[in-house]
């Protein structure tokens, strides 16, 4: 099963999802880090650390972090002691914030931040040992094309880790998530980011995205091996892993 409908931040008929996603993140880039940590109560940092630990067995020297945003996943991956991390995103605004963060913390010697399209990666086959995506694949315009590109640029037996929001199924997390998504995220997102559509898009995009076994089946059909998933915080987020 794939996405049944295309959910875009602004819903403009004359613009692609990719264009609207880039515009949205440019609009909220200055407040993104604060809002991300505030709205998740800082739990997103714990989720990234858990995802990074799943790459320890690979001992990656080259890591690609797609939809890198301001680079939080790339920074978390420094724990693996790689020689090179490439963070790629389509939003210049997010990348600028990320570059400033890397320079300020002295990470710019290992982590490079590049503008690029996750569905048309400018890398040769089998280049990276590992690949990460944090809260980004649901923003792909063509999900399967993006997932195929991810597999292409990772070496044989390399590992791909995808961290993405999902929809809790059990009480009371299901009810908490529904309230948080419908009222808390749009309320604070609008007032702090000044972009009303951006944080209304978040729960809408999560609702439209295939998750759990549906997403695993897509990965397996595209050639990912040993696909597995792990629920976080009662199903608010999920870590998916696969091997090339």
Predicted feature residues:
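Conserved alpha-helix/loop element of class I SAM-dependent methyltransferases that forms part
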Residues: 31-34, 41-61, 76
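C-terminal alpha-helical "lid/dimerization" subdomain adjacent to the S-adenosyl-L-methionine
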Residues: 19-20, 90, 163-218, 222, ...
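N-terminal auxiliary segments of SAM/dcSAM-dependent transferases
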Residues: 1-22
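A short acidic, Gly/Pro-enriched loop at the edge of an enzyme's catalytic core
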Residues: 119-130
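Hydrophobic beta-strand segment of the Class I
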Residues: 32, 131-132
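Class I SAM-dependent methyltransferase SAM/SAH-binding core
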Residues: 62-120
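A short glycine-rich, Lys/Arg-flanked "PGG" loop and its adjoining helix->strand segment in the class I
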Residues: 144-156
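Core SAM-dependent methyltransferase catalytic element
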Residues: 216, 222-244
């Amino acid at each position: 099963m794939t996405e049944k409908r295309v959910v875009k931040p602004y819903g403009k008929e004359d613009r692609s999802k990719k264009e609207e996603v880039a515009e949205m993140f440019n609009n909220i880039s200055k407040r993104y880090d604060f809002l991300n940590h505030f709205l998740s109560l800082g739990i997103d940092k714990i989720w990234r650390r858990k995802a990074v630990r799943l790459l320890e067995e690979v001992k990656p020297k080259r890591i690609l972090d797609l939809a890198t945003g301001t680079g939080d996943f790339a920074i978390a991956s420094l724990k693996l002691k790689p020689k090179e991390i490439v963070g790629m995103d389509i939003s210049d605004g997010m990348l600028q914030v990320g570059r400033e963060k890397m320079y300020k913390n002295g990470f710019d010697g290992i982590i490079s931040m590049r503008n690029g399209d996750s569905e048309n990666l400018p890398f040769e086959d089998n280049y990276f040992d590992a690949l990460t995506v944090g809260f980004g694949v649901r923003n792909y315009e063509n999900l399967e094309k993006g997932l195929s590109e991810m597999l292409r640029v990772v070496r044989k037996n390399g590992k791909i880790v995808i961290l993405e929001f999902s929809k809790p199924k059990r009480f009371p997390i299901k009810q908490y998530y529904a309230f948080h998504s419908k009222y808390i995220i749009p309320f604070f997102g609008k007032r702090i980011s000044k972009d009303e559509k951006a944080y209304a898009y978040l729960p809408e995009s999560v609702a439209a995205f295939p998750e759990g076994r549906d997403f695993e089946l897509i990965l397996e059909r595209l050639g990912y091996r040993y696909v597995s998933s792990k629920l976080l915080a009662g199903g608010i987020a999920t870590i998916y892993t696969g091997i090339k």
